[in-house]
């Protein structure tokens, strides 16, 4: 039976992960203030507007101000004010930004190793398994070096709900109905869409409303459900899927390595202390958005919820899962010789985590 990601499971998982890793801080430690430090301003570039996924970054920004008596200004810029969505990585490299939102699928030629976490239909069915996979993979030199080549390092991992699709026109009733459909589908999910006859395209999230409105695309893939509302796609769409769970997208808040090294040690500690609260802020925001969006969509009568049968989903996984994984390995090996090892590690970590969870039930 296919499973969906649970906000509650993520909350529990993150608590366990941080406790085990030593990242979690005690109340006394978290309350430590460093009011005698220097004034520092960091420019953090985010695309789109403030929404559920950015609540984690907002938390870090506020925490930094509170713990330094406003000396450390971790300043967030929305709406591509500082940099286009696909240019944040370049901005970090040249020193124009101290940090920004970076998605591997926006930079496939630059972050090859990170693409393994964008593959469709990986056996990652809930948030705690996702956290274990991210934690394990980001310990690998290949992933660290992928960002390191651009003078960047990962700070906050973006934990996203699985992807669904929202579109205009006649609601699809089977996978056959996706043939010829123009879809915004990123990374490996784009290859999976192609496998069922769709025409995938990659575009930054801020461009999706106009593309759907003008008919450049027929459907848009996004993390369910907050993103559809954040970019107002629910205002111009006629249907959305509920159980495709096509995959996830590997996005992080990347920060400048040189800027990090120049940061006073107490400010570095503050950024690390903020992480558990930042993850909780994201989780809480996802849950709150679902409670608003789903009843609103149902009540509007304008949006048809599309659920596919188990048989249809198994068919989708068969053509859009393992074949896409194998294709990614072959295309990535010239630049990342350990591509197969990375995929094997993802599968091993996820399967062991799933098995461990089942044994505890």
Describe each region flagged by the PLM.
Residues 8-9, 133-136, 164:
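Proteins with a high burden of low-complexity, intrinsically disordered sequence enriched in S/T/G/P/A and R
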Residues 1-12:
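Bacterial N-terminal signal peptides that target proteins for export
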Residues 29-129, 145-361:
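N-terminal secretory/targeting leader peptides
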Residues 12-27:
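C-terminal segment of classical bacterial N-terminal signal peptides
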Residues 129-145:
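Signature of the catalytic double-stranded beta-helix
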């Amino acid at each position: 039976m296919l499973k969906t990601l649970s906000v509650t499971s993520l909350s529990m998982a993150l608590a366990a992960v941080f406790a085990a890793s030593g990242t979690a801080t005690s109340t006394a430690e978290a309350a430590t203030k460093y009011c005698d430090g220097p004034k520092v301003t960091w420019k953090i570039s985010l695309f789109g507007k403030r929404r559920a996924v950015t609540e984690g970054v907002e938390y870090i920004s506020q925490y930094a101000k509170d713990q330094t008596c406003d000396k450390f200004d971790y300043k967030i810029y929305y709406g591509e004010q500082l940099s286009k969505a696909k240019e944040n990585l370049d901005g970090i490299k040249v020193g124009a930004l101290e940090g920004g939102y970076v998605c591997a699928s926006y930079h496939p030629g630059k972050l090859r190793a990170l693409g393994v976490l964008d593959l469709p239909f990986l056996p990652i069915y809930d948030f705690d398994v996702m956290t274990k996979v991210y934690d394990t993979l980001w310990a690998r030199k290949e992933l660290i070096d992928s960002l390191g080549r651009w003078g960047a390092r990962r700070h906050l991992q973006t934990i996203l709900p699985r992807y669904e699709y929202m579109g205009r026109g006649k609601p699809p009733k089977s996978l056959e109905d996706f043939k010829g459909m123009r879809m915004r589908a990123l990374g490996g999910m784009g290859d999976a869409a192609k496998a069922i006859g769709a025409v995938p395209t990659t575009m930054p999230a801020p461009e999706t409303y106009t593309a759907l409105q003008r008919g450049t695309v027929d459907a848009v893939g996004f993390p369910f459900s907050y993103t559809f509302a954040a970019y107002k796609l629910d205002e111009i769409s006629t249907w959305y899927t509920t159980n495709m769970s096509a995959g996830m997208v590997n996005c992080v808040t990347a920060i400048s390595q040189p800027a990090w090294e120049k940061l006073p040690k107490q400010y570095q500690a503050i950024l690390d202390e903020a992480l558990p609260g930042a993850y909780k802020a994201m989780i809480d925001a996802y849950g709150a958005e679902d409670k608003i969006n789903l009843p609103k969509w149902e009540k509007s009568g304008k949006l048809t919820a599309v659920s596919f049968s188990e048989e249809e989903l198994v068919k989708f996984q068969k053509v859009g899962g393992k074949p896409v994984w194998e294709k990614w390995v072959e295309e990535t090996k010239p630049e990342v010789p350990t591509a197969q090892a990375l995929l094997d590690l993802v599968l091993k970590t996820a399967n062991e985590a799933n098995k461990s969870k089942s044994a505890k039930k």
